[in-house]
């Protein structure tokens, strides 16, 4: 099987372009909110839709991401992903971009790749990082927008940390054993932080794993940012956030997190944040 996949990878290699070359040759645009982005190849996305999606990021969040550029490309993959050594992939693998969609390349592609562009990356600017998003793998607007905003959320938390007000809200929810979480990372780190009721000292008080708590708060904050941005860009139902790996955070708890994020980072002009409840029949 590995030989077949390896042969497939070799057969399509000639149609791929290095991500760094894409960055050098593609004009990067600056949205009205200050976020940098570009489109390359047959993305299958209307330009107006991409602009609307990117512009959903509030100015106050985009201001922290000046070293990021988001590239919408048909398919992104790691060089050698289909080879026998694919199980030992490292961050040093070359990121390759397909300018078109083919079923063969799609089998090897992944949702996004992060690339350190360095001094020769984008418009001569040093130290900018590129995030290459596979638009043709993320076929619908919901999936593509969510993938973009998840990356925005993680990058923002890396730059700024977690506000005290959000940390307090989320930790109080966790201690109160509110049902579910917003991602597998948040779900697992929350359980580790609280120790499943097993981390108790001699005085019967629960011991908190502080490192896991930090990881949990960061994951919960980046998740909340991503879901908030998604709500500004796409109309969706609460149930669409569900995943098999973990129970989704209870609706009221999620609403409380999103309202706080909206207060911290108000929407840009022409965007509106709202939570609508359905009446039970």
Functional labels for PLM-detected ranges:
Residues 2-30, 204-281:
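Pan-zinc metallopeptidase signature
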Residues 25-28, 48-49, 131-137:
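Ligand-binding pocket scaffold of soluble enzyme catalytic domains
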Residues 41:
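Conserved catalytic/binding loops enriched for acidic/polar residues
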Residues 45-71:
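Zn2+-dependent metallopeptidase catalytic core
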Residues 77-169:
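Active-site scaffold of zinc-dependent metalloenzymes
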Residues 142-146, 158-197, 238-246:
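Post-HEXXH active-site segment of zinc metalloproteases
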Residues 197-205:
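Short, solvent-exposed interaction modules
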């Amino acid at each position: 099987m590995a030989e077949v996949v390896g042969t497939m990878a070799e057969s399509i290699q000639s149609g791929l372009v290095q991500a760094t070359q894409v960055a050098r040759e593609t004009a990067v645009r600056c949205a009205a909110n200050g976020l940098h982005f570009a489109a390359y190849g047959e993305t299958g996305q209307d330009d107006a839709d991409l602009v609307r999606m990117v512009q959903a990021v509030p100015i106050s969040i985009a201001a922290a991401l000046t070293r990021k550029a988001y590239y919408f490309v048909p398919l992104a993959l790691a060089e050698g992903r289909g080879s026998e050594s694919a199980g030992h992939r490292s961050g040093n693998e070359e990121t390759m971009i397909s300018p078109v969609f083919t079923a063969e390349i799609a089998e090897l592609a992944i949702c996004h790749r992060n690339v350190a562009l360095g001094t020769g990356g984008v418009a001569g600017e040093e130290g900018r990082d590129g995030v290459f998003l596979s638009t043709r793998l993320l076929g619908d607007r919901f999936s593509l927008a969510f993938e973009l905003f998840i990356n925005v959320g993680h990058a923002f938390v890396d730059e700024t940390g977690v506000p005290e007000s959000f940390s307090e809200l989320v930790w109080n929810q966790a201690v109160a054993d509110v049902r579910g979480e917003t991602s597998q990372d948040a779900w697992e780190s929350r359980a580790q932080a609280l120790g499943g009721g097993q981390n108790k000292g001699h005085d019967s008080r629960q011991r908190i794993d502080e490192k896991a708590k930090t990881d949990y708060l960061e994951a919960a904050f980046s998740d909340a940012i991503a879901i908030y941005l998604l709500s500004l860009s796409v109309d969706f139902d609460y149930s669409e956030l569900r995943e098999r790996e973990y129970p989704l955070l209870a609706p009221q708890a999620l609403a409380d997190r999103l309202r706080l994020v909206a207060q911290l980072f108000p929407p840009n002009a022409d965007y509106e944040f709202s939570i609508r409840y359905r009446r039970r029949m």
